[in-house]
Amino acid sequence: MKVTDAGFFRSLVRLADDGWRMGWHERNGGNLSFRLTEEELRSAEEELRPGAWVPLGFSVPELAGTAFAVTGTGRYFRDAAVKPEDTFGLIGLDGRGENYRILWGFAHGGRPTSELPTHLLTHAVKASLPGEPRRVVYHAHPSNIIALTFVLPLSDEVFTRELWEMFPECPLVFPEGVGVAPWMVPGGRAIAEATGDLMKRYNIVVWAHHGVFCAGEDPDAAFGLMHTVEKSAEILMKVLAVPGGKKQTVAPEQLRRLSEECGVDLPERFLRDKPGQNP
């Protein structure tokens, strides 16, 4: 089977194209990766042409021998559907998780996204956690959530609570909350480690003044996380733009009732009363 005909690949192309159509991927903004199963990799093996090993510059032994579909550095999500072999590539890690090699794609001399450290450290974290594996890591630049990082305190508790209050799906879609990382130089080990640490607790990490990382079980789930958190941020931005701000909102006790009736666990630290608000 051709790589571009494989189900996992078509789902990635759709995610990239949908994200671009939402306006989340200006120019070459954003990146995407999918941790492949052995079966998924075998389905496309007739087209695999392993290249030379390239040092990662760090070690992820938890992912030794694993293959990934990844967007390329400098590539445009706008081109995902029309130039998939150029936009994406498949890479494989060696038996120590210290080197990678290109297996397919990245036409015209391309290479993996510059945010590969953050993707791999996030995948390493998610692969080690119990439950259904979150194999898709998605980074985008949604305008409203970025705008909020200029006006809200850069706090997990503040962002989570404000976003949960906007509409009921938010605490149901991301009941564990939202992590917030301060502004850091993108593409480096420091921001990768900070994101990986937050991904131990969250599936959505906001990069202040930059964008969002989401980790989902599949491309649909990853897109759904990004879509939900950005819609909530859009509503909040509109509320904050109204003179006088909020006149009423969802109270902690209402969120607790939602938690009980829908069977989700909302951490109590996000439900503490805000100044001037009665439960």
Language model segments and positions:
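Glycine-rich flexible loops
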Residues: 1-279
